[in-house]
Every structure is written in C-alpha cells, then in structure tokens.
Amino acid sequence: MAATVNYFEIGTPDSAAAQQFYGGLFGWQIDEPSPVGYRMLDGGAGGLWDTTALGGAAWAIFYVGVEDVQATIAKAEALGAKVLLPLIDNGAIEFAHLADPQGNRFGIWRPKTPAG
C-alpha cells in the first residue's frame, strides 16, 4: 500500500450536531451509528466518530494507508511523533492516531487480510 491519504474522520462528542452541520453544509449522506457509535460518511469516504467514550475530544483527522501499523508507529516516534491512540485492531482494520512534532493529529491504518 502506498503511503497516500485515503480516508478522513471527524471525531465529536455530539454526533447529532456534527451530522446536522456537515450533512447540511456539504450534502453528505451519513449512515446510522454502528453499535460503537461510528457512522460512515458519504458512502465510505470518511467517518464520524462519537468520542464520548474517549473523553469527548473533537478532531478532524486524515489517514494514511501503511503496510505495517506497528512499524510505522515506531518510525514516527523515532522522528518525534507522539502516540495519541495506540494500535487498535477491530477485526477489519488496524489503526492508530499520532501527533506530529508540531501537534497535528493524523492516523495510520491498514486493512486486515481475511483469514483463509
């Protein structure tokens, strides 16, 4: 996987207000929330994450596809990044959130290969 920006996400403690704002502003179709409060935006181009369980932070973030999330975390830390959300494996993807040395939040991710 080339290291390209290929997904975005909006984190919010008020997903109903975010849905109203972004749906109204850009005409995005926003799916009903999953059991963990995640909504797909505009056919999967991005996501809206209810961050209440994560302390209620708000963010806008871009994701870069990588071959190895853990190795990329280590490389980023060596270059001065901080881990904001450690590697999460949700069964379909692995991802993490980091902050660059200037404090900008970004994500890295990779799809999981189906077993078999």
What are these regions (language model features)?
Residues 1-19, 44-45, 59-64, 111-116:
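N-terminal beta-strand motif that seeds the catalytic metal site of vicinal oxygen chelate
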Residues 3, 10, 73, 79-116:
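Vicinal oxygen chelate
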Residues 6, 37-39, 60, 94-96:
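Short beta-strand micro-motifs in enzyme catalytic cores
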Residues 7-41:
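N-terminal first-folded block
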Residues 16-17, 69-73:
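Short, conserved charged micro-motifs
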Residues 18-22, 76, 103:
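Conserved active-site tyrosine of GNAT-family acetyltransferases
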Residues 27-59, 105-111:
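Conserved short beta-strand elements that form part of the metal-binding/catalytic scaffold
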